[in-house]
């Protein structure tokens, strides 16, 4: 059977780093308060010349370089973002043009922090269905542009950045030993939409709006939803938590990540943590963490890797793959 295998991974972060100490000078907050509740120590914030598309392009080029491929080898681009360059056309189309790609097709996906997991799952379906051979999947965000910088409960949490992977069709045996994507599951429940949202949009307020969040409500639901969808993936693949080599979770809050790993029975040393470096970068979070683990020499060929994310909506999902 056809599997979608990971050929390469890449990342891009804005030049400017904003530490918790920097935020202390403009908000009634403290480094201790932020670290204790979230695990975040710093985040990257885009400058005026850095956009979702430019960051996505940079991450894509690094992923292509890691894969040993040229832009002309790509026939599908899926960009997960909630902060597109324009209302339309899709940021994916702009990145396609920036890369000089004229073939194939490109589109955006919007599932907020779950976006990259949704995009990987979607690209996998196109590859297994024979509509694409090589896909560039990008998570890119400039969340700093939709933050209310007077709201200390939200603006300290988020950062900007982009991550990308190249997926390629490869023939597998159809069992758990195959390389590539082995199982995936997606969920959404719109009854929670007012717990994490942006209070603007072209069809309603005709403005961009700002991010609003009921942090305690999100935290209350997160661990249960995350572990439920992961257990679904484990069941599909016929594995247990002990079989996992690396757990690459959405990097929103270290307490949520730790609690999810503990409930699932995933050992602490298998959990990838980058929230301290990047903050919550929404759809860019998972590929940024994945790239970090690869660049640090942690994830090796043959490792069983679990990806997971949860975001506004609520949306949530998980992907199991062998590196």
From Swiss-Prot:
InterPro entries assigned: ACP_syn_III_C (IPR013747), ACP_syn_III_N (IPR013751), FabH (IPR004655), Thiolase-like (IPR016039)
Q: Name one GO biological process term.
A: fatty acid biosynthetic process
Record's superkingdom?
A: Bacteria
Give the main EC class: transferase
Name the job this protein performs: Catalyzes the condensation reaction of fatty acid synthesis by the addition to an acyl acceptor of two carbons from malonyl-ACP. Catalyzes the first condensation reaction which initiates fatty acid synthesis and may therefore play a role in governing the total rate of fatty acid production. Possesses both acetoacetyl-ACP synthase and acetyl transacylase activities. Its substrate specificity determines the biosynthesis of branched-chain and/or straight-chain of fatty acids.
Which residues does the Swiss-Prot or TrEMBL record annotate as the active site? 113, 250, 280
Name where it mostly resides: cytoplasm
State whether keyword Acyltransferase applies: yes
Keywords assigned by UniProt, alphabetized: Acyltransferase, Cytoplasm, Fatty acid biosynthesis, Fatty acid metabolism, Lipid biosynthesis, Lipid metabolism, Multifunctional enzyme, Transferase
Please tell me the species this chain comes from.
Chelativorans sp. (strain BNC1)
In terms of NCBIfam families, this protein maps to: fabH, PRK09352.1
State which gene encodes it: fabH
Q: What is this protein called?
A: Beta-ketoacyl-[acyl-carrier-protein] synthase III
Chain intervals for the UniProt region annotation (ACP-binding): 251-255
The places in or outside the cell where this protein is found are:
Cytoplasm
């Amino acid at each position: 059977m056809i599997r979608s295998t990971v050929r390469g991974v890449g990342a891009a972060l804005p030049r400017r780093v904003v530490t918790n100490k920097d935020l202390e000078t403009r908000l009634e907050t403290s480094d201790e308060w932020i670290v204790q509740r979230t695990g975040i120590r710093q985040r990257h914030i885009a400058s005026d010349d850095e956009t979702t598309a430019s960051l996505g392009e940079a991450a894509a080029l690094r992923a292509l370089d890691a894969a040993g491929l040229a832009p002309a080898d790509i026939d599908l681009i899926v960009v997960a973002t909630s902060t597109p360059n324009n209302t339309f056309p899709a940021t994916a189309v702009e990145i396609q043009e920036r890369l000089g790609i004229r073939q194939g097709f490109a589109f955006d996906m919007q599932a907020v922090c779950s976006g990259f997991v949704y995009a990987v799952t979607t690209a996998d379906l196109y590859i297994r269905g024979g509509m694409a051979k090589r896909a560039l999947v990008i998570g890119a965000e400039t969340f700093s542009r939709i933050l209310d910088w007077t709201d200390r409960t939200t603006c300290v949490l988020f950062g900007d950045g982009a991550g990308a992977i190249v997926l390629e069709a490869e023939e597998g045996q159809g069992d758990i030993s195959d390389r590539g994507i082995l199982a995936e599951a997606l969920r959404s429940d719109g009854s929670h939409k007012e717990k994490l949202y942006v209070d603007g949009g072209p069809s309603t307020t005709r403005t961009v709006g700002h991010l609003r969040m009921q942090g305690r409500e999100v935290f209350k639901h997160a661990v249960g939803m995350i572990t439920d969808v992961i257990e679904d993936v484990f069941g599909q693949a016929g594995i247990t938590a002990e079989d996992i080599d690396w757990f690459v979770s959405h990097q929103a809050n270290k307490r949520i990540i730790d609690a999810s790993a503990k409930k699932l029975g995933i050992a602490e040393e298998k959990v990838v943590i980058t929230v301290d470096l990047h903050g919550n970068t929404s759809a860019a979070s998972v590929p940024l963490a994945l790239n970090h683990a690869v660049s640090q020499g942690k994830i090796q060929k043959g490792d069983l890797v679990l990806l997971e994310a949860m975001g506004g909506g609520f949306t949530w999902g998980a992907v199991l793959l062998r590196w």
